[in-house]
């Protein structure tokens, strides 16, 4: 089981954490949402819970709750710039289908 970050994503997360001045790392998860069933959750983690799984890649701690791990295993988190837009992109090998707007997915 693993989660990885591209260099661009790791640099962006390290920058956000440094500007924030606190935090254990980046928490990734999934929640029920959208027309395809699930959506990604990405937030800073100030604490690591007992049921969390922690990965470290490129100097960044990535924290996943136990229920989300099955949906995120093998995912690579990237940070991309496309024209005037920029943001995190999940490259998830478990995704079977995405909705038309790209906001939710099924496995």
Curated annotation (Swiss-Prot):
Binding site for Fe cation: 35, 99, 101
Domain of life of the source: Bacteria
Cofactor remark: Binds 2 iron ions per dimer. The dimer may bind additional iron ions.
UniProt KW keywords: Iron, Metal-binding
Matching Pfam families: Fe-S_biosyn
Cofactor(s) needed by this chain: Fe cation
A single Gene Ontology CC term: cytosol
GO molecular function annotation: 2 iron, 2 sulfur cluster binding; iron ion binding
GO BP term, pick one: iron-sulfur cluster assembly
Alphabetized PROSITE patterns for the sequence: HESB (PS01152)
Role noted for this protein: Is able to transfer iron-sulfur clusters to apo-ferredoxin. Multiple cycles of [2Fe2S] cluster formation and transfer are observed, suggesting that IscA acts catalytically. Recruits intracellular free iron so as to provide iron for the assembly of transient iron-sulfur cluster in IscU in the presence of IscS, L-cysteine and the thioredoxin reductase system TrxA/TrxB.
Family: Belongs to the HesB/IscA family.
Subunit structure, interactors included: Homodimer; may form tetramers and higher multimers.
The protein's name in its UniProt record: Iron-binding protein IscA
Organism of this sequence: Proteus mirabilis (strain HI4320)
């Amino acid at each position: 089981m693993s989660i990885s970050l591209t260099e661009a994503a790791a640099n962006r997360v390290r920058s956000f954490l440094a500007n924030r001045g606190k935090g254990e790392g980046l928490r990734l998860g999934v929640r029920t949402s959208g027309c395809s069933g699930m959506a990604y959750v990405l937030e800073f983690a100030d604490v690591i819970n007992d049921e969390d799984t922690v990965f470290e890649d490129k100097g960044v701690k990535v924290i996943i709750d136990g229920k989300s791990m099955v949906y995120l295993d093998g995912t690579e988190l990237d940070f991309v710039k496309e024209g005037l837009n920029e943001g995190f992109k999940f490259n998830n090998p478990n995704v079977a289908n995405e909705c038309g707007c790209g906001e939710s997915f099924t496995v």
